[in-house]
Regions:
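Extracellular/luminal ectodomains of metazoan preproproteins built from arrays
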Residues: 1-29, 56
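Eukaryotic intrinsically disordered and solvent-exposed regulatory patches
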Residues: 16-19, 39-41, 53-57, 115-122, ...
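Extracellular/luminal ectodomains of secreted and membrane glycoproteins with large N-terminal domains
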Residues: 1-4, 32, 54, 156-161
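VWA/integrin I-like adhesion module and closely mimicked acidic/polar interface patches used
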Residues: 139-161
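Von Willebrand factor
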Residues: 23-136, 141-147
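Extracellular/periplasmic catalytic domains that process cell-envelope and extracellular macromolecules
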Residues: 22-25, 61-63, 89, 125-129, ...
Length: 161
């Protein structure tokens, strides 16, 4: 009679997914936030919350990532320069304190402001790091021809119903 002791591996449960590490490469990010009439107060508040959660994953506190923000409707509303907030908490506070206004969707005015004012050294833009512009809107600009910009790749993030 022969006896064998064979170890059969017990399947282990799949570990839960780990959160992604914060973005570590240097980057200057400008968020362009639509506050036009079609957004509505509720969606504007949801967008602020989303943006606050998003920036918590960025490496702002080390200075690796700089963030700015522009709101728009009939024109440019709030403008927060890239060198205005050196911590996640400070930028989140600025986001959550934004007040909703109404108006048309003049995306072209906001993008022109980003190009001429935000992406300058005076506003904290660094010439040696990539720039990223994230537009959060619920629809098309009231002036689509003026909104078209050369050499910019758009990745729309839909906000709305």
């Amino acid at each position: 009679m022969f006896a064998y002791n064979v170890a059969v591996p017990t399947p282990r449960p799949t570990p839960p997914p780990q959160p992604l590490p914060p973005l570590m490469c240097p980057v200057d990010i400008v968020f362009v936030l639509d506050e036009s009439g079609s957004i509505g107060t509720s969606n504007f508040d949801v967008t602020k919350s989303f943006l606050s959660q998003l920036v918590s994953r960025l490496d702002i506190d080390s200075g690796n990532t700089r963030v700015g923000l522009v709101t728009f409707s009939d024109g440019v509303g709030t403008s927060i320069n890239l060198n205005s907030h050196a911590s996640v908490r400070s930028f989140q506070s600025a986001i959550l304190s934004l007040r909703y206004s109404q108006g048309q969707t003049f995306t072209h005015d906001a993008l022109a402001h980003v190009r001429t004012t935000m992406l300058t050294s005076a506003a904290g833009d660094r010439s040696n790091v990539p720039n990223v512009v994230v537009v959060l809107t619920d629809g098309a600009s009231n002036n689509p021809t003026a909104t078209q910009v050369k050499n910019i790749v758009f990745y729309p993030i839909y906000n709305g119903r």
